[in-house]
């Protein structure tokens, strides 16, 4: 439906041309155009008496078609050389065919204005633009190493945004783990320093009292290492698929930024699966119905 609307609303290129005519008692002016596809309009600006006009009443009349398609006559200006030799109409627009005549007076009367034409863009120029686009796409494919990626740029952008969010969450988790490990390492260093400060005499005294050699305590250090190894071995829970509402919000944000969503159902389903890791068929159908309602 969107493609058909684009075809109907083809771009128009407005063109303006000067218009002018002379009216006399026995000389009317007929303004008509050929049956072409362009829209024409006559915009009248000024009506003025000529240099040789007599000091008498001149009435200028226009005849055209009304809304119902019936002919209608209207008075444009009433002129007299000693009272009002010229009248400004300020852009009196009439759709052709139009007949301009001098209803009263001998003239001459001069009418000036603009002939407006709304010309559609040439089909040849559109074909040339399409050929240029095709040439650019072909050259881009040839220059891309390794055949290039077939994933559209907008899909890659959405996936990149999600990866950035995941990376931010992982960085936060790693920062928390580093803080915990620093605290444990600080606790481990305190007993180690105490054991270093103990003199050999005390160690010998303890060994004589117990009847066996004393061994330096390595429990805090070993616990810290074991906890750090556990943290390294513990796999992080993979992030599950986004909810339907979150996906709708992200799609809406992408549309507001100037992006677009696939119009074909199969492409849309692949887009949802690849970008949002969604595998629930009911949720995908819900998203497709929402996409069609846009």
Curated annotation (Swiss-Prot):
UniProt keyword terms in alphabetical order: Acetylation, ADP-ribosylation, Chaperone, Chromosomal rearrangement, Cytoplasm, Cytoskeleton, Disulfide bond, Host-virus interaction, Isopeptide bond, Nucleus, Phosphoprotein, Proto-oncogene, RNA-binding, Ubl conjugation
Similarity-based family: Belongs to the nucleoplasmin family.
Residue numbers spanned by region Necessary for interaction with APEX1: 1-117
Effect of residue 219 to A: Partial loss of phosphorylation
Region (Required for interaction with SENP3): 1-186
Predominant localisation class: nucleus
Chain spans, region Interaction with NOP2: 187-215
Impact when changing residue 290 to A: Partial destabilization of the structure. Complete destabilization of the structure
Source organism per UniProt: Homo sapiens
Gene Ontology molecular function: any one: protein kinase inhibitor activity
Residues modified as Phosphothreonine: 75, 95, 199, 219, 234, 237, 279
Coiled-coil ranges per UniProt: none
Record field: compositional bias (Polar residues): 202-222
A single GO BP: positive regulation of protein ubiquitination
The protein's name in its UniProt record: Nucleophosmin
Site (Breakpoint for translocation to form NPM1-MLF1): 175-176
Compositionally biased region (Basic and acidic residues): 188-200, 223-235
Record cross-link Glycyl lysine isopeptide (Lys-Gly) (interchain with G-Cter in SUMO2), residues: 27, 32, 141, 150, 215, 248, 250, 257, 263, 267, 273
Effect of residue 263 to R: No change in the sumoylation level
Post-translational modification: Acetylated at C-terminal lysine residues, thereby increasing affinity to histones.
Site residues by UniProt (Interaction between pentamers): 55, 80
Motif position, Nuclear localization signal: 152-157, 191-197
Keyword ATP-binding: no
Known outcome of mutating residue 268 to A: Complete destabilization of the structure and loss of nucleolus localization
Impact reported for residue 4 to A: Abolishes phosphorylation by PLK2 and impairs centriole duplication
Reported impact of residue 250 to A: Increase in the stabilization of the structure
Region spans: Required for nucleolar localization: 243-294
């Amino acid at each position: 439906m969107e493609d058909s609307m684009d075809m109907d609303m083809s771009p128009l290129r407005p063109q303006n041309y000067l218009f002018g005519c002379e009216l006399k008692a026995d000389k009317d002016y007929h303004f008509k155009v050929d049956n072409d596809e362009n829209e024409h309009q006559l915009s009248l600006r000024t009506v003025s008496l000529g240099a040789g006009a007599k000091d008498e009443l001149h009435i200028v009349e226009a005849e055209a078609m009304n809304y119902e398609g019936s002919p209608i006559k209207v008075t444009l200006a009433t002129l007299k050389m000693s009272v009002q030799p010229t009248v400004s109409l300020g852009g009196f627009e009439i759709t052709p065919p139009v007949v301009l005549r001098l209803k009263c007076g001998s003239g001459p009367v001069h009418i000036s204005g603009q002939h407006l034409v709304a010309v559609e863009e040439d089909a040849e120029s559109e074909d040339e633009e399409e050929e240029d686009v095709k040439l650019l796409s072909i050259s881009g494919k040839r220059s891309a190493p390794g055949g290039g990626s077939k994933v559209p740029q907008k899909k890659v952008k959405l996936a990149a945004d999600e990866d950035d969010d995941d990376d931010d969450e992982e960085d936060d988790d790693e920062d928390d783990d580093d803080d915990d490990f620093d605290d444990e390492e600080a606790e481990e260093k305190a007993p180690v320093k105490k054991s270093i400060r103990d003199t050999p005499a005390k160690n010998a005294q303890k060994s004589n009292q117990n009847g066996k050699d004393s061994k330096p305590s390595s429990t805090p250090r070993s616990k810290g290492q074991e906890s750090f190894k556990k943290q390294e071995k513990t796999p992080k829970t993979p992030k599950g698929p986004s909810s339907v509402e979150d996906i709708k919000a992200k799609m809406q944000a992408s549309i507001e930024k100037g992006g677009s969503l696939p119009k074909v159902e199969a492409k849309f389903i692949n887009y949802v699966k690849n970008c949002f890791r969604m595998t629930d068929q009911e949720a995908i159908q819900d998203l497709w119905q929402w996409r069609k309602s846009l």
